Amino acid sequence: MFYKFIQVFIGFFVKLIFRVEVFGMENIPKEEKRLIICGNHKSNLDPVTISAIFPRQIFWMAKRELFKNKLVGGFLTKLGAFPVDREKNDLKAIKTSLTILKDEKVLGIFPEGTRVSEIDYTTIKSGIALIAQKTDSEILPVFIEGEYKAFRKIKVYFRKPVKINKEIKYSNEELENISQDIMRMVYGEEIKWKLF
């Protein structure tokens, strides 16, 4: 109830101020099933924008620094966000992600780990592919285009969802390659070979 209220309230202003234009809504799975939102990260407003237009609640993985302020941290927690330590393999965050997906909910991740202005696929580790395969979840690549300036247009593209074959045992290097390919899909690149 709280999430829905905030979604509608903040969503109204986000759509109004940034004139959000959405493409590919037909690519969003209709069924209430396990799903990972995987997006590029340009601004702290990215999760707000995606959440404002997405029909289901998204449980965002967010940098732990945001939770240091008790007021902000409490608000984010109430919205379903949870902290991740980007400097190490955060097992607690991984376990939280697995629980969210096993409960047939939607997990939101920015695999680049921080806001970026230039693409560098080599920074993408195996995490998203590993979590997706372990939970047999679909991945929905999402691309945000534009600058967050008043009355400038922001465009959101929902790409076609993909799923990793859970029956195949991949090496860590292969999982990294898959994760990097998923980010290529986010940016609209055509993948000529696939491991999934």
Where are the model-predicted features located?
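N-terminal membrane-anchoring alpha-helices
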Residues: 1-19
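Catalytic core of membrane glycerolipid acyltransferases/transacylases, capturing the structured
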Residues: 2-3, 15, 29-88
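Short, basic, glycine/proline-bearing loop/turn elements
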Residues: 10, 78-84, 111-114
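Glycine-rich, highly charged phosphate/nucleotide-binding loops
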Residues: 21-23, 88-94
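A secondary-structure boundary/capping signal
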Residues: 24, 40, 62-63, 80, ...
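Residue-level "edge-of-site" marker
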Residues: 26, 89, 145
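Short amphipathic alpha-helix with an adjacent loop that forms part of the alpha/beta core around
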Residues: 26-30, 98-99
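Non-catalytic C-terminal accessory region of glycerolipid acyltransferases
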Residues: 94-196
